């Protein structure tokens, strides 16, 4: 027999956790004072008037470093749960994780040889 009442706590939590943010936005929209003026329309930079043009171009080097960082950050996110349950999972999962790390190392070596990590 299918017992759906076992999921009542889950559905109650889901509904309550969805209703609370919606209510917070609605209440803040109703209670917040509406004031428009030149101060509200101006940009704000650490308490001072902004100087210069806001559109700055970053060098492509920053993007390459950021991309390599994101790749290895995601690797850490994937490998941490695996490391925490290593003794339960067995050798086959170890081999899969090893292949995953080797693919990322090959990608790092490729980026290194192509000069993506060179600053000059």
UniProtKB/Swiss-Prot annotation:
GO terms for cellular component: chloroplast thylakoid membrane; NADH dehydrogenase complex. The chain crosses the membrane at residues 9-29, 64-84, 88-108. Its EC number is 7.1.1.-. Keywords: Chloroplast, Membrane, NAD, NADP, Plastid, Plastoquinone, Quinone, Thylakoid, Translocase, Transmembrane, Transmembrane helix, Transport. One of its GO terms (biological process) is photosynthesis, light reaction. Pfam families: Oxidored_q4. It is found in: Plastid, Chloroplast thylakoid membrane. The keyword Secreted does not apply. It is a multi-pass membrane protein. Belongs to the complex I subunit 3 family. NDH is composed of at least 16 different subunits, 5 of which are encoded in the nucleus. This is NAD(P)H-quinone oxidoreductase subunit 3, chloroplastic. It comes from Nandina domestica. The lineage of its organism: Eukaryota, Viridiplantae, Streptophyta, Embryophyta, Tracheophyta. The gene is ndhC.
């Amino acid at each position: 027999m299918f017992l759906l009442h076992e999921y009542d706590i889950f559905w109650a939590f889901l509904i309550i956790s969805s209703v609370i943010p919606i209510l917070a936005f609605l209440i803040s929209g109703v209670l917040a004072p509406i004031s428009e003026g030149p101060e509200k329309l101006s940009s704000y930079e650490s308490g001072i008037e902004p100087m210069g043009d806001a559109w700055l171009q970053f060098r492509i080097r920053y993007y390459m470093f950021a991309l390599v960082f994101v790749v290895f950050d995601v690797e850490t996110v994937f490998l941490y749960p695996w490391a925490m349950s290593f003794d339960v999972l067995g050798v086959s999962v170890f081999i899969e994780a090893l292949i995953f790390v080797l693919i990322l190392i090959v990608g790092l070596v490729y980026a290194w040889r192509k000069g993506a990590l060179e600053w000059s």
